[in-house]
Each structure stands twice: as C-alpha cells, then as structure tokens.
A protein has these predicted regions:
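Aromatic-lined carbohydrate-recognition surfaces of secreted/lumenal glycan-active proteins
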Residues: 224, 363, 367-380, 408-434, ...
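Catalytic domains of carbohydrate-active enzymes, especially glycoside hydrolases
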Residues: 52-71, 311-336, 387-396, 439-446, ...
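Active-site clefts of carbohydrate-active enzymes
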Residues: 293-297, 302, 426, 458-480
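Substrate-binding cleft of secreted/luminal carbohydrate-active enzymes
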Residues: 254, 258-259, 325, 444, ...
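Aromatic-lined substrate-binding rim segments of carbohydrate-active enzymes
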Residues: 86-88, 101-111, 316, 332-374, ...
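His/Asp/Glu-enriched short active-site or ligand-binding loop at hydrolase and phosphoryl-transfer sites
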Residues: 126, 187-199, 220-226, 234-278, ...
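Metal-dependent polysaccharide deacetylase catalytic core of the NodB/CE4 family, i.e.
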Residues: 33-39, 89-91, 111-234, 268
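Active-site groove signature of glycoside hydrolases
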Residues: 92-97, 232, 328-333, 375-404
Length: 521
C-alpha cells in the first residue's frame, strides 16, 4: 500500500503540472463512465472494452487531480429528491459484467482513492457452478474469471460499491428475423416457429428475467438492486417502465453525453471507455473536448434492388468504403401496382419481412445508423408505427414535417415505447419557419435541399443542426462535389445524397466520406 501511495503522490504532482483543470459543469450535471475488463500490464492484445490496470490508475489520479468528484448512486438520488446538491464536476463510475478483475484490480484502487462505484452483475453468469464454463457473449470462459459472491459481499461491505443489475440472462442475442440475425435480447421480439413474440410475451420475458436477477442479488447481498444497467446499453421505454416498477428507478444506457438535472433517471447516459485510451484521450473525452462527427448521409431504397440479398451485399460494400453515419432507408416497395411494406404488420400489405435484416446488416457491417424514411400519411397510423418499432432495429426517423409538429411528436412517442432513443431528421416540404430551430431537440437535424435559398435561411450558430441534401439524379457528380467543398468552407459540415448512385460518383464519395478528411477543431 505504501508503494501505491507513493505512486499516487508522484502521479498527482505530474498531472497537476501538465493538465489544466476542466471547465465546471452546470449545477446538477454529472457524467457517467462505463468500464468493463481491467487487464494486467503484461496482457498482450486487449478486447475492445478492456483497459490496462496502469491506465485505470492513471485515469483515477487524473480525475482527482483535475477536481472531479466521483459520487455514489445514493448522492445522485438524494440530489433529485431535495437533498444536498451534487458537487461541481460530479462523476459516477460504473463497471459492467462482474469479471474477477473488478475485485482483484479495481477494488484496491477504489480503497486507495476512496472512489465509490457501481458494479453491474449478470446473474446467469454467476450462477454457473465453480469449475464450469460461462458463455460470455459467445466465448466460453471459466467461471473463475468472474467474481464470487464472497467477493461481491466484501466489496459491498466497504461502502464503496453498489451492486446493480445487468439482467439475469439478457446479455445475449436472440433470433430476430427469418434471415437468422441475432439482436439484443432486451429490445428484440424473439422469432421462433415463424412467429414473433407478442407484446404480452415479450414483456413477461423481461419481467421474469429482471425479477430473477433482483432476487438473486438480494439473496446473496441482502439488498435488492436500485439500478439496471442495460446490456449493450439497449432498452426502450416499456422496458424502462418495467424496471422502475420492479424497484430500479435508475437505468443506465450507452448514450454519450452529460446528464443534467432534467435527464430522466431511467435514461442515464454513459461514456463507454474503450481500447485502454491514452491519458490525453481520456482527459479530452471527460472534458467534452470532442465534438460529434458531422452527419453525412445517403438514401437507400431497397425497392430498387432486383434481388434483396444481392442488392444489400453491393450496398454494404459501398457503405463500408464511404462510412456515412446516417443511412435513410425507405421501408416501402410497390408490388403489382400496390404499395406494400417490408416489415410485419396488419395495417398495410406486407411484401416481405426484410427491413429488420436490412437495417441490422447496415448497422453491424457498415457501421451506419439507420433512419427510416416515414411517409407523411403514416404519421397518423399509430398502429403501423408501433409495428415498425416492434419489429425493426433502427436509430432514427426522417419525418416530412417541420420541427415541433404535433403529429410528428405523437408518432415519435408511439415508436419510442418499443424503440428508444430515436433521433429525428425533419425534412419539411414547406418553407422553414423562423422558430423551427428552437423546436429541434438536441441531436435532431433539419434536412433541407442544398440550394442557395435554403443556405440563406440558416441563422448564425445553427450550422450544426442542418443537413443539406443533394439530388444525384439531377446534379452532376462534379457539381455536387464542388458544392460540398463550398459548404464545408462556409462552416456547413453536414450534407448527404438523396439517393445511392451505383457508379460515376467517386468525386462525391471523397468529399462525403469523413475518412478522407482531416480532423478539424
């Protein structure tokens, strides 16, 4: 311990000299950091979510040196219930999965720094008998690589560790569609025997799982969990409501961002710590020095593919080269002169159950979040929108209305019961009103045709909330490429294509792709 204390004093002195203090957060604000495995310094290659023990110690020292105040879950709850306010630069530390290193490597650091943390446990893994093997997201590893219940109780007795639920057995994929994709169990309707789970069966499955883990944790620690840490960060409003009902008012996601006094407790945001970042990278992330990447979009119309798998394969190849971070996808096709949809519903004719497969492949293989292009006449059909959200995995929607439109907000509320959170790209057909900008939620976009008239409509300071769209069917590639360069020079870094041309657009790709551009401040 003396060696550790000397190490801490030396490192703190260095950090005070080298790193400036971060800017103060607003009253009531706090950030949450999400850690997983903590490996030894001698480990070779690391998993994506692992950090080295030495890097973690340096990060803890930097937090202390920079004036951050790790707080407990109880302090956050007290601050929301009229108790003492959170300190400036408040921060909550969380460790997911319950690997053995949280006891052998993290716990000694917690005692050294006196940092409180939340440790999230998956009951199914801990219920494997000693000497058995745990199916850890498809990889068999020994049960001994996870904490024992004796370890858990020792950490809990310290007063520094609060135990949260990470579900009993939702940390896995389940069959999600006829094509064989597996998707997160907490938000996916299981597909079996050619049918999907109903609302009742889905919610009963979640209730049984969450209740079982609560009972298991209470059995071994004497205290039921007050927080659910959603596996893969995936949940929806129905699942969040269920967790609250079962005694877990706090829910944790993997949405980036600062939690403010207005952030709902069941929807707390967390920064995922990945790939054992350097101390500088860690500091920049915590101090919010990294702005989100600008939106770059393409529009994909599966109805144009003669064969779905062949068309999807070609599209994925192009997306991997381009790497857009918004893929607008049309959910409709026309068959025999009749409009039909690509997902299960009783509200309209169904051409095929393919949209979930298409959206999942685009997200997983190309890394492009999918936004569903909603026809305006769908906004009033809440049953149709609920079916879309039940059966398709997507990140957002494009709505052909102005920001704040009541029909759009009601439609969004319906979908977020089953698919949350949803970003919105508003694409109004009419002229943009002066108050449209203030009606945008954080993270939402206003999509406008790339014209000089629309460029003139954008108020000062709003460039980061508009996405200009070019039509590859009417504008030559060289002209689009020049216009994109002019937009970026004028501070408008968000643009896209209202289509997905097959060939001849190399000049556009190099301007659209973030990979080909330098990092800008």
């Amino acid at each position: 311990m003396a060696i550790l204390n000397n190490f801490r004093r030396a490192l703190l002195a260095l950090l005070f000299a080298l790193l400036p203090l971060a800017a103060a957060q607003a009253a009531g604000d706090f950030i949450v950091l999400c850690y997983h495995e903590v490996e030894s310094e001698k480990s070779g290659s690391l998993t994506r979510t692992a950090v080295r023990a030495g890097d973690l110690a340096a990060q803890f020292a930097w937090l202390q040196a920079s004036g951050y105040h790790p707080v407990s879950l109880q302090q956050i709850l007290d601050s929301r219930q009229g108790g003492p306010a959170l300190p400036d630069k408040a921060l909550l530390l969380t460790f997911d999965d319950g690997k053995k290193d949280v006891f052998t490597r993290v716990f000694p650091l917690l005692k050294l720094f006196r940092f409180p943390v939340v440790v999230a446990l998956t009951g199914h893994w801990l219920n494997v008998p000693d000497g058995g093997m745990v199916d850890y997201d498809g990889v068999p590893i020994p049960r001994s690589e996870f904490v024992s219940w004796a370890d858990v109780r020792e950490m809990q007795r310290s007063g520094l560790v609060e135990i949260a639920s990470h579900s009993y057995d939702l940390h896995r994929g389940v069959l999600a569609n006829p094509q064989g994709n597996t998707q997160p169990a907490a938000t996916t309707r299981v597909y079996a025997d050619s049918v999907y789970e109903t609302d009742e069966v889905y919610l009963a499955r979640l209730r049984t799982d969450l209740r079982r883990n609560n009972e298991l944790i209470k059995q071994h620690t004497g205290v039921p969990p007050r927080a659910i840490v959603w596996p893969y960060g995936r949940s929806n409003r129905a699942a969040q409501d269920l967790a609250v009902e079962l005694g877990m008012p706090v829910g944790m996601t993997l949405e980036d961002g600062v939690n403010t006094a207005n952030t709902a407790l069941p929807q707390l945001k967390r920064y995922l710590i990945e790939e054992s970042p350097s101390l500088q990278s860690f500091a920049e992330a915590v101090r919010h020095l990294w702005s989100p990447d600008p939106a770059r979009s393409v529009r994909i119309v599966p109805a144009q593919w003669p064969l779905v798998e062949e068309g999807l394969s070609r599209t994925l190849d192009e997306l991997q080269k381009l790497s857009p971070n918004v893929a607008f996808v049309d959910p409709r096709v026309t068959r025999n002169g009749q409009k039909a949809v690509l997902f299960p519903t009783t509200r309209l004719p169904v051409a095929a159950d393919e949209l979930n497969h298409i959206a999942w492949q685009i997200e997983r293989r190309a890394g492009s979040p999918v936004f569903i292009d909603l026809p305006v006449d769908w906004l009033g059909d809440h049953g149709l929108l609920a079916d879309l959200a039940r059966h398709v995995n997507f990140a957002g929607v494009r709505i052909p209305r102005a920001p704040g439109d009541e029909h759009a907000l009601r439609a969004l509320n319906v979908m977020e019961r089953w698919r949350w959170p949803l970003r919105v790209a508003y694409a109004p057909k009419e002229a943009v009103a002066a108050d449209a900008w203030r009606r945008l939620r954080p993270g939402d976009l206003l999509v406008l045709p790339a014209t000089a008239a629309n460029l003139a409509l954008v108020p000062a300071g709003e460039a980061g909330r508009v996405l200009f769209e070019f039509d590859p069917g009417t504008q030559p590639p060289a002209e689009i490429a020049r216009a994109m360069r002019r937009l970026e020079a004028d501070g408008f870094r968000q643009f896209g294509l209202a289509g997905f041309p097959d060939a001849g657009f190399d000049p556009v790709w190099s301007n659209l792709s973030l990979r080909s551009q330098p990092l800008l401040p």
